[in-house]
Amino acid sequence: MQHAAPPKRRVWLLGVGAVVVVVMLWGVVAWRDRDDSSATAATDGGGQQTAAEVPETTTTTRPPYDGWVDPLSSGEKWDVETDGYLTFRGNPTRSWYGEGPVPSDPQVLWTYPGAGGMCGRSSDGGNVSTWCGDGWTGNPNVFERDGRTWVSFGGYDYGLHWLDADTGEEIVDTYTTGDLAKGSMTTDPDGFPLSYKGSRDSNFYVVATDRGEQPEVLWKLNAYDYGVQKIWNDDFDGAALVIDDHLFVSGENSWFYIVKLNRGYDAAGKVTVAPQLVATLPSFDDQLAVDAPDRHWSIETSPTISGNTLYFANSAGLIQGFDISRVKDGVAPTRVFRYWTGDDTDATIVADADGTLYVGSEWEKGNARSKQVGQMMKLDPSRPDDPLVWSLPDQVAGKAGIWATPALGDGVVYFATNAGRVLGVDKVTGEVLWEKNLGSQTWGSPVVVDDTLIEGDCEGNLNAYDVSDPRVDPPLEWTVELDGCIETTPAVWRGRIYLATRSGQFYALGDPDDPAATTTSSSTGSATPG
């Protein structure tokens, strides 16, 4: 997603060899066992176990993973202290989309704000205009804390918001940044009352929410800090990851950051951080300077981690993977994977349980490389010299391709295109199993929870499809008609759906028998069964 580079500071020409800055760290990773198994002993008619009837005991418990993120956790709820949906696409492999049940007949339960809308003035391409609501990627966080369900998000009113998920009332006052707070927030996974969020004001914020009604910024990362030379823009759109006290965050200034947070509490019991820079990683290299000399090298993807490899992509289409296995020992990340899509790759990379990557890329430049490799693709990092497993084109006239992050299902990967196509694709072969056309822009990422596929369009329709058999054209379950284009990605949490639109409103949706239905604010939203 390209924005004109704001004329804030002179862009200096620099050598584009890989630059990595590292400081010594210490610490270990503690990984919890997962035990999803159950065993039932066989008995005879009198209730006594018999040797012939006692089945062999099996277990599905995985041993603790010695590394950053177990690849086998792909598709699973993030196994952390905080109970919730905590970051864009739910977990470090960007492959978990929320917890059901999914409403069967949703209606608007409440909207926020109660009057007016979340709107702010900002520039794009040198033109200043009013932006309302929330847009790409705009995936809310929903989590449990102190006996209460919270929902948090950034808005186009410059604000960071923390609401009661049952009522829409503010739990913590809005924190106002200096520009649009676009992108998706991350909530601390380890129980610390911290939120992590970027803004178009060139800052990435770490905010404490344990100071009563007033949020407090404990630390800011500025796009011009640490001596990096901004290449393109200075926004922070990507949703950070926090793992083992390390913050992983991407910048539109063309740099990626790893920071040791050193979280703790002071004598008064208030949360603290003492951040230390661990590494800065460039989104570019010398070859990219030849292939993409316009220097549009910003990172809008959220970081993805599978095993000990960190992945991100940039607006020139360069996908990189860095080995971070020894970062905690003070060893610099080393690049172990490189692939060039040829065009703007803003959709976040998704990793499956095999460590295979699913990538969506845009069709804007129309160059030979993007024409060759397509816009929907599967990559295998274990064969770095020839990683492309399959690809599909989306090369209609004008801007085309993928802004939405793909979703993984049962043997199927779901893609949504700029022009409104939604596709179910065989994960192994790349065969298109079925396709729908929603008729308008689909930038929100597909959401799959409890065999229901949810996708919004730019006419304000939030659509749900039955994908209990994902290999057949899924029937429509319901449509909710909202005001404004849906660019955001909804969050599903225990019978509710949360999202914002470009109308200026944030919505909570649920079934009519939801207890919150009696406190519905005035709204024009309505549900239409499929």
Where are these regions (language model features)?
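Compositionally biased, intrinsically disordered low-complexity segments enriched
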Residues: 4-5, 16, 50-51
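Extracytoplasmic/lumenal domain signature
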Residues: 47-83, 88, 95-136, 141-237, ...
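N-terminal export leaders
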Residues: 12-13, 264
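Intrinsically disordered, low-complexity regions enriched in serine, threonine, proline
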Residues: 6-7, 29-31, 59
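Hydrophobic membrane-insertion alpha-helices, especially the h-region
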Residues: 15-27
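C-terminal region of N-terminal signal peptides and the immediate post-cleavage residues
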Residues: 24-49, 528
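Terminal targeting segments of Actinobacterial cell-envelope proteins
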Residues: 1-9
